[in-house]
Amino acid sequence: MSLLDRPLVVVVLISALWWACSRHRRPAALGRLSVVAAALAAATVVFDGPHWQLVPWQAVGVAVGLVAAMRWWRPGRSRRAVRVLGRGALGVGLVVGALALLTASVPQLPTPSGPHQVASQIFRWTDSSRPETLTLDPSDHRQVVAQAWYPTDTSRGRRVPYFEAQHRLPSSVAGLPSFMYAAFGEIATHATFDAPISRTQRRWPVLVFSPGLGVPREQYTALCTELASRGYVVVALSAPYESAPTVLAGGRVVGQTVHPDVMGPPPHPELQRLIDIRAADAGFVLDRFAALAIDNRHSPLAGHLDLHHVGIVGHSLGGATAVQVMATDSRFKVGVNLDGKLFGTQPDARLHQPLLWIQSDDPRTPEYTGGRDRLLAGLRGGGDVVTVRGSAHMSFSDAPSYWTATGRTLLGNSAGTGSVALAAMTRTTADAIAAFSAPALGMAATATMPQVLAQHASLRREPLVAAAGV
C-alpha cells in the first residue's frame, strides 16, 4: 500500500460506520470527516490510480462525501431517504471493501533462492527476412523483443520495473482492465539493469521462455528470475500484437490486436499460425545471440552465452511452441512444457531431445490428454510428466500473487490461479526444471528428479511416460 492507502481505509471505515450505525451523530464533525474521506478517495485515484484492492474503499469514500452533501443540501424531507439508502449502500460498500482487502493483495514476487544475484537486459530486433503478418501494413517486418535474465555478482544498479510500460499500459492487459495493474509499479523484481554477468564461470547455458497466449512476458518474472539465480540465462520472449503491452524498437507500445478463437473446434489454424511465428522468433533470437559477441561488445552477455547448451520452456501456447521448436530446431537440447495443449501435427512429432511436461491439477479435456499421450508415445529422447497438486493453469505465471492466502483458498481455483502460493509454485517448478534439464545443458545437477519428487509433496509423477513406452 502507498502512504495514502492506509489512511483512506481507516478514515472511510470510521466515517461509513458512523453514518450507517450511529443514532447520535454530530453533523459538523461527521461532515468534516466525510469531506476528508472523499478527499482521500480522490487523492488515491489521482496519485495511485483506481487499483482493484482499493476501488471499493475509494467508492465508499466518495459516497460518504455525497451523503454529507445531500444532508446539508436538503436537511428536511430527504433525511429519512438519505438515511435508509445511505446505510444500505455504505454497508454493502464496506462488506465489498473488506472482502477485497481480505482476498486481493498488491503482488509481491518471491526473492530468488539461487546463489546468484539477477540482472536483466532487453533486446529489440527486426527480422528483415520475415514480413509482419499480424498487422495490416504490408511493409512491416517482424519485430522481436527479448528480455534476458541472467546471473550477476552485484545487486547494485538501476532496478528493473515489473512492467516495462507501466505508465503506458493499453486499456486491457491479459484480459483485465489496465487500472487493475496500477499498483504493479510497486512490485520488486529483485533484478538490476545491464549489470556485468557473473564471473564465476565463463559461459552460461540458455533457456528461451515462451509465454502463454495473451500473457505478457513480465508476468513470468518470478520463474525467470528464480532460474537466473541458479545459473541460467533465461530469455523471455514477447509476443507482439497477441499480448500486451509490448514496447517495440523506437519506444512504440502496442497492445493486443490478435484474438484467436481458442474455444473453436480443432485443428485451430489461427493458433497454429501464432505458434509458427513464435517458433521462428525463438530461432531468430539464437541467431542474434550467436552474432552478439561480434555485433555488440557492449552487451554484458557478449561472449558469455553457451549456445551449445540451449533449452526452451513455455507455458500454455508457449508450451506448444516449445514442442514445435524442439521438433524443428536441433539447437534446442531440452524442452519443458508447462501445461500446454498441443495443436496441429505436434502430437505426432518424434522428439529426439528430452521433454519435461509439468501440468496443473486442472481437469483435462480429451483433446489435451490425447495430444499429450500421442506425443509421449513417440518420444525418442526420454521424458517425464509431473502434476503440481493444487495448481491451476495460470499458477505457472505470477498470477497467484494477486491473491492473499484467503483469496487463493476461496477464489484461486475458480480464477484459474490455484491454491498454491507463488513462492511455493515457483520453487517447485524451478526445482523440477533444473533437475530435468541440467544433464542436457551441461549443468551440475543439485538434485535428481526422484529427489525433487521426494522433496515436494505437491509434485505427483504420472504413469503416462512408462505407459507410453518412454
Label the model's feature ranges.
Residues 100-207, 415-422, 435:
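Domain-level recognition of soluble alpha/beta enzyme cores
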Residues 285-350:
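Primarily recognizes the serine-hydrolase "nucleophile elbow" in alpha/beta-hydrolase
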Residues 241, 248-304:
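Alpha/beta-hydrolase active-site loop
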Residues 333-395:
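The feature captures the conserved acid-bearing segment of alpha/beta-hydrolase catalytic domains
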Residues 78-105:
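Internal/C-terminal transmembrane anchor helices
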Residues 86-88, 377-470:
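C-terminal catalytic-base region of ester-bond hydrolases, centering on the histidine
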Residues 187-247, 364-366:
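Short substrate-entry loop that stabilizes the transition state in hydrolases
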Residues 28-72:
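Membrane-embedded alpha-helical segments of integral membrane proteins
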